[in-house]
């Protein structure tokens, strides 16, 4: 019989080889998906991580920086695993939070072990008040151009003779001084005493404005010295300022003193210490 008219049987080996060739050609494209006209390799692990990180990382990525059009986002696990592999300069530096108070100063607390006690502060204040021969008196101005504003005057002072400190500053004033006109309307004033004549500033040749030099501020009411204390006021002022005896008499000089109500001491680079009035008058100035 002739086999030319019959259908030729298919060989299993040829079909198997054809399938193997097709699979070999298509196997490199198994890890690719087509999105528009751009393709990239996506594995199952990355696909799962991207799905899980889509809701966690999308919002922070939008809030980080809006200055660039292109934003690079990574899964949370990639940040943790690749931190040690990245150079230090590759991470974007986040701006430091702004300070809440730029010009705020720390107040001195009484619980600090290093801070001196009230008695030491009171002694320093009394020493500074006794050593000072001048100070700046700030009054509330009555001048029409600066009415209600502070007005400062540098005046000679004395808290008593050399060996008799009282802690109360005395003044030798004239009615023609603008500060006196202010005190008639408002007797409240502040007296600032810098440590310009102290031992520390002299020995170390430090400017009086240096924070290491103490500054004392006395606040209270300015009053005229009563007749019974005029003789003591003369001794206090003329013993420290002998030239006052020869000042022109037509200026009608008279004595005033400050009734101290508040004491503030600023020393070193720290804050301001509020010294109780009782401690201030109880303390004694250091001997020179």
From Swiss-Prot:
InterPro entries: CREG, CREG_beta-barrel, Split_barrel_FMN-bd. Glycans are attached at residue 164. Its main location: secreted. Keywords: Glycoprotein, Secreted, Signal. It is found in: Secreted. Residues 78-100 are annotated as: Disordered. Brain specific. Changing residue 164 to Q: Abolishes N-glycosylation. Changing residue 186 to Q: N-glycosylated. It comes from the Eukaryota. One of its GO terms (cellular component) is extracellular region. Residues 1-31 form the signal peptide. Belongs to the CREG family. This is Protein CREG2. It comes from Mus musculus. The lineage of its organism: Eukaryota, Metazoa, Chordata, Craniata, Vertebrata.
């Amino acid at each position: 019989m002739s086999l030319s008219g019959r259908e030729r049987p298919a060989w299993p080996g040829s079909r198997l080889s054809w399938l193997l060739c097709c699979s070999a050609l298509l196997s490199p494209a198994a890890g690719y998906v087509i999105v528009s006209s751009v393709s990239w390799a996506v594995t199952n692990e990355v696909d799962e991580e991207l799905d899980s990180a889509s809701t966690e990382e999308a919002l922070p990525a939008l809030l980080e920086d809006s200055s660039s059009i292109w934003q690079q986002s990574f899964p949370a696990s990639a940040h943790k695993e690749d931190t040690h592999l990245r150079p230090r300069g590759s991470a974007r530096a986040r701006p430091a939070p702004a300070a809440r108070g730029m010009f705020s100063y720390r107040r001195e607390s009484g619980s600090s072990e290093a801070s001196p006690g009230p008695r030491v502060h009171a002694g320093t204040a009394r020493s500074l008040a006794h050593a000072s021969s001048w100070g700046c008196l700030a009054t509330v101005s009555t001048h029409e151009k600066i009415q209600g504003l502070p007005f400062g005057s540098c005046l000679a002072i004395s808290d008593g003779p050399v060996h008799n400190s009282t802690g109360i500053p005395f003044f030798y004033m004239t009615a023609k001084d603008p500060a006196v006109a202010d005190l008639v309307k408002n007797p409240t004033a502040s007296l600032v005493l810098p440590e310009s004549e102290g031992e520390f500033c002299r020995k170390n040749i430090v400017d009086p404005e240096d924070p290491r030099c103490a500054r004392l501020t006395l606040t209270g009411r300015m009053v005229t010295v009563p007749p019974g204390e005029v003789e003591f006021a003369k001794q206090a002022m003329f013993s420290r300022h002998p030239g006052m005896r020869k000042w022109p008499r037509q200026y009608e000089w008279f004595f005033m003193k400050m009734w101290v109500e508040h004491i503030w001491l600023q020393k070193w680079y720290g804050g301001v210490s509020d010294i109780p009035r009782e401690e201030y008058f109880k303390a004694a100035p250091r001997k020179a």
